[in-house]
Amino acid sequence: MAEPDIKSFERRMDGAVETLRKEFGGLRTGRASTTLLDPVYVDAYGSSSPLNQVATVGVPEPRLITVQVWDRSLVKAVEKAIREAGLGLNPQSDGQTLRVPIPELNQERRQELAKVAAKYAEQARVAVRNVRRDGMDMLKKLLKDGDISEDEQKTWADKVQALTDAHIKKIDEALATKEKEIMQV
């Protein structure tokens, strides 16, 4: 009797949840976070580089991010990249260090960010459901090929469904936490 590889489905579902957490990290709330600048790429040395490859990013205060640029010649490029990243941030140069104050979010922007968070969560739910569908298809194939009995197929299908439910619950909890964080004034 063949045994379905449920662990691979669990890893794929975990990956969807982890991707969601990373996307949530990039959403700006009223608080400073180093992950806020993850989507920033700097034109440096003839190519586009992630900010963390040309500078050290820190959070000395809850509403301030500091960017310590390693190469003085890149300070202007880093400042421009942060300003043009569409994050609504305005860095101020202080020698080789950039200070990036995190402005208060207005209610309209908070609601907009909550919608974006909900969209990310829905994408993660779809990814988890796709993994579930793949698992169910594999179980049907194993049943059709005679590798497992109908009872075994039902048992494994219940396990795949339980995994799906657990991961959807994690996604919903992460969304609720992020929405609360975004809406907090």
Curated annotation (Swiss-Prot):
NCBIfam families listed in its UniProt record: frr
Predominant localisation class: cytoplasm
InterPro entries attached to this UniProt entry: Ribosome_recyc_fac, Ribosome_recyc_fac_dom, RRF_sf
GO molecular function list: ribosomal large subunit binding
Keyword Protein biosynthesis applies: yes
Gene3D superfamilies associated with the record: 3.30.1360.40, Ribosome-recycling factor (1.10.132.20)
Protein known as: Ribosome-recycling factor
Compartments, as annotated in UniProt: Cytoplasm
Family: Belongs to the RRF family.
The keyword Kinase is annotated on this UniProt entry: no
Function recorded in the entry: Responsible for the release of ribosomes from messenger RNA at the termination of protein biosynthesis. May increase the efficiency of translation by recycling ribosomes from one round of translation to another.
A GO term from the CC aspect: cytosol
Keywords: Cytoplasm, Protein biosynthesis
A GO BP annotation: cytoplasmic translational termination
Lineage of origin: Bacteria, Pseudomonadati, Pseudomonadota, Alphaproteobacteria, Rhodospirillales
